[in-house]
């Protein structure tokens, strides 16, 4: 392989990666969410959502309602949680606070929240409200995360494929 051919392959890869990044950022701006698409990682929302379902989020609503399925993050933890709004209340400044619970869980999420936090702040803790989903499409993400053999096999196949491609 000559250097020119390698440069073309590198630039094509850079184009694909930058296009994917721009599409993600555009979707983030449109939905007003830093993570507009998430994968369900646990069974806490069964039967509504199964492990591996991809959820599409929207964060342009001013308030979440009781019964809405929301995705939130807890300060200091990196994994978003998908649960249903169980209760809501407003303070004197009309800020909305939410209590959530997984459909398949026996108790509410109070034990999951940060210390001394009784409710989620709708403005700061919510990633978005679920507006749609694709069943089981995100299961590949779970396989890559949880199965080291699958991860390295997939990486190896991608590497071999890129080495053997002529375009």
From Swiss-Prot:
<dbReference type="InterPro" id="IPR019756">
    <property type="entry name" value="Pept_S26A_signal_pept_1_Ser-AS"/>
</dbReference>
<dbReference type="InterPro" id="IPR019533">
    <property type="entry name" value="Peptidase_S26"/>
</dbReference>
<feature type="active site" description="Charge relay system">
    <location>
        <position position="83"/>
    </location>
</feature>
<dbReference type="GO" id="GO:0005787">
    <property type="term" value="C:signal peptidase complex"/>
</dbReference>
<comment type="similarity">
    <text>Belongs to the peptidase S26B family.</text>
</comment>
<dbReference type="GO" id="GO:0004252">
    <property type="term" value="F:serine-type endopeptidase activity"/>
</dbReference>
<keyword id="KW-0812">Transmembrane</keyword>
<feature type="topological domain" description="Cytoplasmic">
    <location>
        <begin position="1"/>
        <end position="12"/>
    </location>
</feature>
<dbReference type="InterPro" id="IPR001733">
    <property type="entry name" value="Peptidase_S26B"/>
</dbReference>
<comment type="function">
    <text>Catalytic component of the signal peptidase complex (SPC) which catalyzes the cleavage of N-terminal signal sequences from nascent proteins as they are translocated into the lumen of the endoplasmic reticulum. Specifically cleaves N-terminal signal peptides that contain a hydrophobic alpha-helix (h-region) shorter than 18-20 amino acids.</text>
</comment>
<dbReference type="GO" id="GO:0006465">
    <property type="term" value="P:signal peptide processing"/>
</dbReference>
<keyword id="KW-0735">Signal-anchor</keyword>
<keyword id="KW-1133">Transmembrane helix</keyword>
<keyword id="KW-0378">Hydrolase</keyword>
<feature type="topological domain" description="Lumenal">
    <location>
        <begin position="31"/>
        <end position="167"/>
    </location>
</feature>
<protein>
    <recommendedName>
        <fullName>Signal peptidase complex catalytic subunit SEC11</fullName>
        <ecNumber>3.4.21.89</ecNumber>
    </recommendedName>
</protein>
<keyword id="KW-0472">Membrane</keyword>
<dbReference type="InterPro" id="IPR019758">
    <property type="entry name" value="Pept_S26A_signal_pept_1_CS"/>
</dbReference>
<feature type="active site" description="Charge relay system">
    <location>
        <position position="109"/>
    </location>
</feature>
<feature type="transmembrane region" description="Helical; Signal-anchor for type II membrane protein">
    <location>
        <begin position="13"/>
        <end position="30"/>
    </location>
</feature>
<keyword id="KW-0256">Endoplasmic reticulum</keyword>
<comment type="subunit">
    <text>Component of the signal peptidase complex (SPC) composed of a catalytic subunit SEC11 and three accessory subunits SPC1, SPC2 and SPC3. The complex induces a local thinning of the ER membrane which is used to measure the length of the signal peptide (SP) h-region of protein substrates. This ensures the selectivity of the complex towards h-regions shorter than 18-20 amino acids. SPC associates with the translocon complex.</text>
</comment>
<dbReference type="InterPro" id="IPR036286">
    <property type="entry name" value="LexA/Signal_pep-like_sf"/>
</dbReference>
<dbReference type="Pfam" id="PF00717">
    <property type="entry name" value="Peptidase_S24"/>
</dbReference>
<feature type="active site" description="Charge relay system">
    <location>
        <position position="44"/>
    </location>
</feature>
<keyword id="KW-0645">Protease</keyword>
<dbReference type="GO" id="GO:0045047">
    <property type="term" value="P:protein targeting to ER"/>
</dbReference>
<feature type="region of interest" description="C-terminal short (CTS) helix">
    <location>
        <begin position="153"/>
        <end position="164"/>
    </location>
</feature>
<dbReference type="InterPro" id="IPR015927">
    <property type="entry name" value="Peptidase_S24_S26A/B/C"/>
</dbReference>
């Amino acid at each position: 392989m000559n250097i020119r051919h390698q440069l073309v392959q590198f630039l094509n890869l850079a184009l694909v990666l930058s296009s994917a990044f721009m599409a993600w950022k555009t979707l983030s701006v449109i939905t007003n969410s830093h993570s507009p698409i998430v994968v369900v990682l646990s069974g806490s929302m069964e039967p509504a959502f199964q492990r591996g379902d991809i959820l599409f989020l929207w964060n342009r609503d001013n308030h979440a309602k009781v019964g809405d399925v929301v995705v939130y993050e807890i300060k200091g933890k990196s994994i978003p949680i998908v649960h249903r709004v169980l209760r809501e209340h407003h303070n004197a400044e009309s800020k909305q606070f939410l209590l959530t619970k997984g459909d398949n869980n026996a108790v509410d999420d109070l034990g999951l929240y940060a210390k001394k936090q009784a409710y989620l702040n709708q403005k700061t803790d919510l990633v978005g409200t679920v507006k749609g989903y694709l069943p089981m499409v995100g299961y590949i993400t779970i396989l890559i995360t949880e199965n080291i053999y699958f991860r390295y096999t997939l990486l190896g196949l991608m590497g071999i494929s890129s080495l053997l491609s002529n375009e």
